[in-house]
Amino acid sequence: MMDEVEGSEKIAITHSLGCMNWMLAAMTGQFEKPFDRVLFVAPPDPIKTNEAEGIQGEPMDLHHPEVLPAIRANTKSLTIIASDNDRWLPRGIRIYEEALQQQAVVLPSAGHFSLDDGWGEWRGLVNWVEFDKPGDLLTR
């Protein structure tokens, strides 16, 4: 479905488990054409997600040798935004920064970027989509 739209930029915005789902889809060849831009919002710690009810199997290994090449093959640009107090990321965003060789944008005290954390409309996200400036993501 993501390859059906013709025309302008192909952008994926993923949140939490959606980040891991996107990586898995990239690793298993689910995308026909690479994305122009991908945004990971509040990617979770794979170990923490495995503790959640209903999730089975081994935690995703961010350092698996197929992860980084799959991401690079399936997006021209990856942006990661995380918080310094996300309950689903207890080991911190550095686990993604190291594994994906990508510096994240960190928004202090943003929690898990969810309604429970006081999030609703996010002007910075709209700006990021329109203008492709990661710094815009810091604007609530």
Question: What are the residue ranges of the model-derived segments?
Answer:
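Active-site nucleophile elbow and catalytic-triad environment of alpha/beta-hydrolase enzymes
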Residues: 52-70
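Conserved acidic catalytic loop of the alpha/beta-hydrolase fold
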Residues: 1-10
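Conserved alpha/beta-hydrolase "acid-adjacent" motif
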Residues: 86-92
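Catalytic histidine-centered segment of alpha/beta-hydrolase-like enzymes
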Residues: 110-121
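Active-site nucleophile loop of the alpha/beta-hydrolase fold
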Residues: 38-48
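Short beta-strand/loop motif that positions the catalytic acidic residue
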Residues: 74, 79-82
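Residue in the alpha/beta-hydrolase core beta-strand immediately N-terminal to the catalytic nucleophile
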Residues: 10-15, 36-39
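Gly/Ala-rich beta-loop-alpha elbow adjacent to hydrolase catalytic centers
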Residues: 13-23
